[in-house]
């Protein structure tokens, strides 16, 4: 997806969302979702979409080792940034952002690992509801979230801000120390090689 197409997509997605019958929420906050040592020398931001198969692949095959070898070792601080690339992904991101932030990583991990069951089903919203119930979300709350204009607007605003800074053109994209940008579901060895190429790891 090119940058121009992505910018157009963001505008179209915003119009689609605004066209829904929304009920407004009050004083919604989107706290950063970060794992790892506060003062870790390497800060990695991941931009991901919950309906993106490449994102699901990264979180299944690469992230566990990144967590074990880099994050838990104090070398990396890792931030998760919602970057939904379609309406269904926006719904899923809104679900993840509507539970306590300390459960966000567990929730998105479950959504990504079960992506084929809900995102590519004949009735994805119903399947998303089934998964949401595992997080303690009732059907009533689920419907409220899917009609929460303010929450979705804040997610969109964050997307626009990050895209203007780093020209995010696909998911997953990783920004390292606000300087280096890499894209794709890299294998762990490829991921580490990039960090070494940037002279961030020995």
Task: Identify the role of each PLM range.
Residues 49, 130-202:
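C-terminal cap of thioredoxin/glutaredoxin-like
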Residues 34-36, 68, 165:
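Short secondary-structure boundary/capping segments
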Residues 27-42:
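A short beta-strand-turn-helix
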Residues 10-21:
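Bacterial N-terminal signal peptides
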Residues 43-46, 77-80, 173-175:
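Soluble periplasmic/extracytoplasmic beta-strand elements of cell-envelope proteins
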Residues 1-10:
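Bacterial N-terminal signal peptides that target proteins for export
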Residues 48-50, 56-134, 138:
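Structural alpha/beta surface segment adjacent to cysteine/selenocysteine redox centers
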Residues 43, 48-54, 170:
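Short pre-active-site segment immediately N-terminal to redox-active cysteine/selenocysteine motifs
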